[in-house]
Regions:
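Secondary-structure capping and domain/repeat boundary segments
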Residues: 1-228, 233-240
Length: 240
C-alpha cells in the first residue's frame, strides 16, 4: 500500500522450498508477465508468483531379508526428481531374492522422500541322491543363504567319498541335485564252503570253510579244494 505515484521499492524475490521463483504474472493462468513499475499506480493490482519445480534429492532404501527372517536396511541410494512430481524408481535385482514390485512416491520439497523396497529370500529345491539315478535320500525346498547340512548316508561295502557337486555351507541361488559318490571297500570278508559227495548215501557234506577277503563288487574265483585222493565212507572213515 502506498500513495499514488510514489516511488516503489522492488521487493526481494519470494522463496519457496523446492521451487525456483520465475517472475510475477497478471493472471492466475500465468500467461501475462507483470513488471513491477517504478511508481505506484493509481489502482490496486493483484499479481501472481510463478514457480518452477527444482530437482530435489530423494532416497531408495533396500531391505534384504536375513537368514533369521529380519529385514536389514542396506546403504541408501540417492536419486533426484522435480518437487511434487511422482517418481517410480526401478528396484534392483539381487541374486537369491524376490524382486519387489515398483512403488510410486511423490518427491517432497524438503528432500525427505524415501522409497522402501523389501526383498524376501527365494526358496530353491534341493535333491540328494544315494547314487547316480539312484534312491532319493532327501528332496525339499530351502531358503537361499540359510545354513545347509547334507543328509547322512550309508551304503554297506562302500566308503562315502562326498557329494557331487560339493555341497556348499549355505543354500545356493538355484535348484540343485547332489549325488553321493562312493568307493568300493577293500578287505570285505567272504566265505568259501567246500562240500564233498557222499558216495553211498548221496548228497554232499560240508567239509571246510575258508574265510577270504576281497573288494566290494568285484568278481572273485574261489580256489579249488584238494579232495581228489579222498573217498568218503558212510561213517566218515577215510580210505585210500
Amino acid at each position: 500500500m502506498g500513495k499514488y505515484n510514489s516511488d516503489i521499492e522492488k521487493p526481494e524475490d519470494p522463496v519457496r522450498t523446492g521451487y525456483r521463483f520465475a517472475g510475477w504474472y497478471e493472471d492466475e493462468e500465468l500467461t501475462t508477465p507483470y513488471t513491477i513499475p517504478a511508481k505506484m499506480p493509481n489502482k490496486e493490482r493483484m499479481v501472481y508468483a510463478k514457480w518452477e519445480a527444482e530437482d530435489v534429492g530423494y532416497q531408495v532404501v533396500e531391505y534384504l531379508e536375513g537368514t533369521n527372517g529380519v529385514y536389514e536396511a542396506q546403504d541408501p541410494i540417492s536419486y533426484s526428481g522435480l518437487t511434487d512430481t511422482e517418481v517410480t524408481p526401478k528396484p534392483a535385482e539381487h541374486e537369491g531374492y524376490e524382486t519387489p514390485k515398483e512403488k510410486t512416491e511423490t518427491v517432497r520439497a524438503d528432500g525427505t522422500t524415501v522409497v522402501k523396497y523389501y526383498y524376501p529370500r527365494k526358496e530353491y529345491h534341493l535333491t540328494f541322491l544315494m547314487e547316480e539315478n539312484g534312491e532319493t535320500v532327501a528332496s525339499d525346498d530351502y531358503r537361499y543363504g540359510t545354513f545347509l547340512t547334507a543328509p547322512a548316508v550309508y551304503r554297506p561295502g562302500y566308503e562315502f567319498q562326498g557329494w557331487s557337486p560339493e555341497v556348499p555351507e549355505s543354500v545356493p541361488a538355484g535348484d540343485m541335485t547332489y549325488t553321493a559318490t562312493w568307493k568300493a571297500s577293500d578287505g570285505i570278508p567272504y566265505a568259501v564252503r567246500y562240500y564233498v559227495e557222499e558216495p553211498e548215501e548221496g548228497g554232499y557234506t560240508l567239509s571246510e570253510i575258508k574265510t577270504m577277503t576281497g573288494t566290494t563288487g568285484e568278481t572273485v574265483t574261489a580256489p579249488e579244494g584238494d579232495y581228489s585222493s579222498v573217498i568218503y565212507h558212510r561213517k566218515g572213515e577215510l580210505a585210500s
